[in-house]
């Protein structure tokens, strides 16, 4: 199970679009689930335990995963920073 859920990431994305007024809505939820699974695999199978490394995985994987129509990099950055903030 992901430390950060797809529902949370979608909420972050929607808030970014609302606040900035820039970008188009739309999410490929299956792609997003795959992105989050990739992070889980790194944590559990490659023993990634460092919080900063996990945060980096969130930022990079969400940005490169292109689960959203617009705002992937912004969402990746915001999710990464939020993850660090709540830890």
What are the language-model segments listed below?
Residues 1-87:
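FIC/Doc superfamily catalytic core
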């Amino acid at each position: 199970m992901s430390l950060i859920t797809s529902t949370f990431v979608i909420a972050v994305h929607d808030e970014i679009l609302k606040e900035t007024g820039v970008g188009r809505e739309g999410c490929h939820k299956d792609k997003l689930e795959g992105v989050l699974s990739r992070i889980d695999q790194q944590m559990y199978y490659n023993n990634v335990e460092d919080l900063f490394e996990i945060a980096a995985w969130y930022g990079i994987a969400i940005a490169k995963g292109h689960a959203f129509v617009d705002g992937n990099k912004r969402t990746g950055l915001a999710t990464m920073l939020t993850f660090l903030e709540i830890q």
